């Protein structure tokens, strides 16, 4: 039996302000830093020791991973950063307040943009300052790989090569792996692992800063999955994510 630990970054400043964040590189709040440290304590208490960790190229995930490894006394651990673990790109919604956007376009439309599988938000133009094409961390990417907007289907498509070519082989070789990423890049992985339908994925919400443990068989099929920590607090955190875009 193999354990894989998934963790959404701690609360960011734009989580606190209820904004669509996407690829914008916003930092953690003080609460987010505490969530990250607490996640490390929960993982350590579970007796899990990592061999390798993966995260995005966005500081809210990177800093969360640092805090986790610090609490586990594993700051030396090999860490691999990839844009393929970035949050989905919210296009022209990036930076907008979710509640205000719901008031303007309607809760139903915003829910489709936030949680549907194959409907992306309105796209950015390449001349928009929010388009990440000029960011040096994406310098090695082809222009066509840098998104103007993404739905979850797009996020799955750009994440799965990293899973199949890099992460899954590490797990199969016996390595204990941590993936610290974002709500939608983790939804992409959970959809794949649990074979969740395109309709049912709409209802999946992942809270910030709470470790999600998968127990996998030798074929990397899930035997079970569970959040660490107080389960009532987990339910409240999941419900809070679900309610973010209510008008």
From Swiss-Prot:
Transmembrane segments: none annotated. The keyword Isomerase applies. Substrate binds at residues 8-15, 21-22, 60, 87-90, 98, 114-115, 183-184. It comes from the Bacteria. The active site is at 9 (tele-phosphohistidine intermediate), 87 (proton donor/acceptor). The record marks 182 as: Transition state stabilizer. Keywords: Gluconeogenesis, Glycolysis, Isomerase. It holds the Pfam family His_Phos_1. Pathway: Carbohydrate degradation; glycolysis; pyruvate from D-glyceraldehyde 3-phosphate: step 3/5. It catalyses: (2R)-2-phosphoglycerate = (2R)-3-phosphoglycerate. PROSITE patterns: PG_MUTASE (PS00175). GO terms for biological process: gluconeogenesis; glycolytic process. GO terms for molecular function: phosphoglycerate mutase activity. Signal peptide: none annotated. Its EC number is 5.4.2.11. Catalyzes the interconversion of 2-phosphoglycerate and 3-phosphoglycerate. Belongs to the phosphoglycerate mutase family. BPG-dependent PGAM subfamily. PANTHER family: PHOSPHOGLYCERATE MUTASE. This is 2,3-bisphosphoglycerate-dependent phosphoglycerate mutase. It comes from Chlorobium luteolum (strain DSM 273 / BCRC 81028 / 2530). The gene is gpmA.
